[in-house]
Amino acid sequence: MDRDQTNSSLFNDDPVLHATWLYYQEGKSQTEVAAIMGVSRVTVVKYLQTARENGLVHINLDVNVFGSIDAALQIRDKFNLQRVIIVPDGEHAGKRDDTKLMRTRLSRAGGMYLNQVIENGDVLGVAWGRTIHQMSKTMTPKSCKNVTVIQMLGSMPSQPDLTIIESSSQIAYKLSGRVASLHVPAVVSSARLAMELQAEPIIRSNFDVLTRCTKAFFVVGNALDENPLIRVGVLNKKEMQTYRDLGAVGVICGRFYDKEGMPVVADVDQRILGISLAQLRQIERKIFLAGGERGYDATLGALLGGYVTDLIVDEGTAEFLLACELPH
């Protein structure tokens, strides 16, 4: 039996497995793999992409490398964080204001990092938004035991680029876990209705899950009219202006805070169904993604408020955090 026949037998005639082994295990170049298999280099690229998408290959950020660069260490020590990951501009230098590109890069880094830090038995609270929705679709599957994923804010009607319940469900699926949904809107018409809904046993039980979160995963949210909370109907522009007038610079799961991280409370707070900032602060590991100049103040406020333990940022945000002066 010749070498080609042996390889075909070893990999059960699966060209994806064969290409993956040659490229990642034997260290062959894509051109060499193509020659060995008798296919084009483009075909090899497609095989390797299929392997990543199907979970045959796990590409992880080495947190010891990315977290040990001088800037990351300085930010970690300055804000008393557990871990800081800076996503380098690389070939995207000069494109920091491209929000779509930023979202793609942060979602990939966030998915890789979450994959590394998630542990068996974790209860993971996730916010919803476009970055997390994108991450849920692209993160690599990981086999975990007894992981529960719960959204930290009630739901709203789905948008073309954002399906709220699907995001938490997909993350749970990728982590071999189960999803716990709040089964309530993010905002209701009155404070009384909000209290009555939370008193319902089935809803109460899921809110209780929030108090048992061991990790939380969320993205920077500013207090500008571009915030998705307005687009999906949680707030209107007048209500957002009220928060700004009260000093709000950022928002996490519908809860606003000022430049020093102190909660900013308005009438609508009593109608929002989700985790509170006080509850969020109690979670052991709080993983925060931030990128883009319009999120600088919100990122700083979140750090000062104690809502973050693990920070993943772009280079621009890292430069801002290194240069900013802390309040005395």
From Swiss-Prot:
UniProt GO BP: regulation of DNA-templated transcription initiation
**A Pfam family reported for this protein in Swiss-Prot or TrEMBL:** Sugar-bind
Keywords on record? DNA-binding, Transcription, Transcription regulation
User: What InterPro entries does this protein map onto?
Assistant: NagB/RpiA_transferase-like, RNA_pol_sigma_r3/r4-like, SorC_transcr_regulators, Sugar-bd_dom_put, WH-like_DNA-bd_sf
GO MF terms listed in the record are: carbohydrate binding; cis-regulatory region sequence-specific DNA binding; DNA binding
Q: Does the keyword DNA-binding belong to this entry?
A: yes
Top-level taxon of origin: Bacteria
- Which cellular component appears as one GO term in the record? cytosol
Per the record, DNA-binding region residues lie at 72-91
Task: Give the family from UniProt.
Answer: Belongs to the SorC transcriptional regulatory family.
PANTHER family linked to this entry: TRANSCRIPTIONAL REGULATOR LSRR, TRANSCRIPTIONAL REGULATOR-RELATED
Task: Supply the name of the protein.
Answer: Uncharacterized transcriptional regulator YjhU
Q: What is the protein's species of origin?
A: Escherichia coli (strain K12)
- Gene symbol? yjhU
